[in-house]
């Protein structure tokens, strides 16, 4: 394979040295004339971790944070929502660990078509008694495998999740010891849920009757540890971040986070969008989710063997 250059309306083959020299010269001219932010770098979730990391390092050396990749329209809402709930924006467990779950609730995920390998683990879990709940506006191929299918209105995920929390709090099903030891602010959530998200309000918003919401809440209570699975169905909303946080809060209330068979299984939209987000070209963070603050830059200046004042 060779690089191609458009000359007189036709692409002609040029050498790698010529391509690198011409591109480098034009980029430096742009930087000199308009500053480092005049160039925008687009990464890819198709890059492996090393390639994504190297691109972020290159952009940092270039003198800019003007970079991004597919996560911006994929799971950036998840990264922010999960990170702001318990500190790190990634799924907590793994595909194979779902075989240790006693109940699994899919909300915003059509795993049968989008992540078929993951569903094999769920089907194995069902063989040992795991209950499978699918919450989706459409009856999907995943819903066809469910023990309980819940049809909600599109975008009403929070109402349904808080409807579950209503019954959990009302019946005292929350893991009080876990919350006391590990969770801050759950009392405020409880107050709001019990005051505002009564069964009639939940049904009005998401279209699910109280009996079915209570049934799902009972299953989540009686079958622990349980996991919550989501994908694009949660993130592709203007309130995607809030939906993600509601899912996380539900798991914290049940004491399911940090346990085998529990947690949040967040299925990504591209093959390495998680790795690219962890270490790659994000405009608002350095590799490993280090924020764009002085301490982070000092850390990476040392790691990269360059002077902090230079970078």
Task: Tell where the protein language model's regions lie, with residue ranges.
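Core structural elements
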Residues: 190-195, 213-226
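Conserved short loop/turn motifs at secondary-structure junctions
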Residues: 40-47, 204-208, 231-239, 270
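Active-site phosphate/pyrophosphate- and oxyanion-stabilizing loops and adjacent acidic/basic residues
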Residues: 56, 200, 218, 248-251
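N-terminal export/assembly segments and adjacent metallocofactor-ligating motifs
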Residues: 1-171, 182, 189, 209, ...
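Generic recognition of flexible, low-complexity loop/linker segments
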Residues: 27-29, 91-95, 213-218, 253-254, ...
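A glycine-rich, hydrophobic/aromatic-adjacent loop/helix-cap motif
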Residues: 220-311
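Flexible, glycine/charged-enriched surface loops at secondary-structure junctions
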Residues: 34-38, 174-179, 227, 258-265
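Internal, active-site/partner-interface "lid" segment
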Residues: 172-197, 202
